[in-house]
Amino acid sequence: MRRRYNSAMPADAIPLSRIRRVLVTKLRHHGDVLLASPVFTALKAAAPQVQIDGLVYADTAEMLSGHPDLSELHVIDRSWKRLGLMGQGKAEWSLLKTLQSRQYDLIIHLTEHPRGAWLSRLLKPRYAVAPRVSGRGRFWKGSFSHFVPSIMGSGRRHVVEQNLDALRRLGVQPAHDKRALTFVPGADAEAHIAVRLQALGLEPGKFVHLHPPSRWHFKCWTAEGWAEIIARIRAAGWPVLLTAAPGDKEGHLIERIQTALAQRSEPPAASLAGALSLKELGALTAQARLFAGVDSAPMHIAAAMRTPVVVLFGPSGEGHWGPWGTPRLGTHQVIAQSAQFNCRPCGLDGCGGGKVSECLTSIRPDQVWAAIQPLLKD
């Protein structure tokens, strides 16, 4: 029987009813992986019979694990490189055999990573979709059945929508109510955080969660600015809880904030810096009145948990990376200096590549407080 033409769909739209298993790959950082979660939700809603697997780096697996529309989650461990040629080869071979056993009908490759082309050729799905990448040769172009076109001014289109464009290219229009981020902390993380909050004397919904650092210094605001904000939040009657990722890269800013508080004769802020897993961070921020921070994975986790977000943006673009979704109360608030700095968003690692972004460090505490204060009112 000839397929009926539908002008509202691509001419080469895939027949969803024939798809049984799908592999979605997102080989990027933590926040990038979380921003791919709506692909699973929207695809499952459009094709309930489909089993959807994910392939991510092992250190980002917590961003997707527990997703209700995820069948199996496969990982690539970047530490395999330290196993030597034989050890890495054995690990890669084991992963390949596992993926081959799943017999995928469709691969959705959401990045420009060259591994996607190899996987498409080795796994031999009926269909495979990837971004159209300028300058890629025959190997890339011959590895996929469908390509997502690049768009002018893509920095103004949110990453979530860009991920969903892979579905649109295949003829699947994502339902508006299926585009939310999904992050599942899990019962263990929630129980752990309940104990932690009780030990700190903090009640659910009665504290402000601040995550000032980013792994990238050029995305960070000043320690003095954060100390001023902490003082104002406290003066309004709200306790503050600081978090940061393990390690000195983020922990150093927390130390500087505590020092700045001491210089203001303020007591140190309660802190769980370096003490939480990503799942626990999600369970924590879900209990906060609001989250304040910078462009980082914890910001995206807070948005996924529907916690109101106040976020400071510098060289990265809020149209591309801003908080996604609808919070429990109020609205997400983005603070950016676009009028004063018409060079932003530039995407550089600081002005002139110097690791300090003036469009970010020039943000005044008054601007941040003006965004936070309304969200603290009952």
Indicate where each model-derived feature is located.
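Catalytic machinery of carbohydrate-active enzymes
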Residues: M1-D378
